[in-house]
Amino acid sequence: MKDLPIIALDFESKEKVNQFLDLFDESLFVKVGMELFYQEGPQLINEIKERGHDVFLDLKLHDIPNTVGKAMEGLAKLNVDLVNVHAAGGVKMMSEAIKGLRKHNQHTKIIAVTQLTSTTEDMLRHEQNIQTSIEEAVLNYAKLANAAGLDGVVCSPLESRMLTEKLGTSFLKVTPGIRPKGASQDDQHRITTPEEARQLGSTHIVVGRPITQSDNPVESYHKIKESWLV
C-alpha cells in the first residue's frame, strides 16, 4: 500500500473522476466514498485499478455481523487496497468483516472508523450520548478494532500519537481532516496540516477539497505530497 496522500475523489460521476485523473501522469492513491460508489458502482473501481492507482473504498460498513460479513465477501472481489467498517458495530461485526474479506482476498487492509473528524465534543455528549472525551471514545473504538484483528483505524491526526503509544506503530492511523496552511476548514473540526499529521504519527492522510477543488490540482497535490513525505 503506497505511502502517498490519499486523494478523496468526492465527485458525483465517472466523467468527472476521469477528467481529474487525466491531469496526472503518475500512480496515485485515491479514496472512493459513498457518493461516488453509489452513483457508479463496482465498475468504476475496476477502471481506476486498471489505470494503476491504489484504491481506498470508504463505505463505513455498519450492520449486523452476518450482513457485514456477506457484504465484505462481495467487496473483496474488487481487490481494492483498503476498506473500512464502523467500529461502533462491535467486535463481532468487525471479526465477521475480516472473515468475509479473507474468503476471496488476502492482501486488502481493513480498518475501522472511530469518530468522524466533523464530530465535536458537544456532538459526542449530546447527540451520541457518549460521556467521555473524543480522545477516550476514539481509543475505546481503536482497542475494539485491534481486538477484532483489524489493521488499524480512521481517526483524526490529533489522536494518532495516543494510538501509537497504546497500540503500536504498525497499527494504521488513516487520518482525514488534513488542511494545508491557509486552506478553508470546511466542515472539518479536528484538523492538522500534512506536516503535523506526520509528526503526530499518522500512517496515511486523506485529502479531498484542497486538491480536487484547487485551481491547479496537480500542483496542490505535489505540495501536499512533499510536505507529507518530508
Swiss-Prot record:
Record SUPFAM superfamilies: Ribulose-phoshate binding barrel
Gene Ontology CC terms: cytosol
Positions with a binding annotation for substrate: 10, 31, 58-67, 117, 179, 188, 208-209
Keywords associated with the record: Decarboxylase, Lyase, Pyrimidine biosynthesis
Enzyme Commission code: 4.1.1.23
Keyword Metal-binding annotated: no
UniProt key word Lyase: yes
Official protein name in the record: Orotidine 5'-phosphate decarboxylase
Organism: Staphylococcus aureus (strain Mu3 / ATCC 700698)
Lineage per the UniProt record: Bacteria, Bacillati, Bacillota, Bacilli, Bacillales
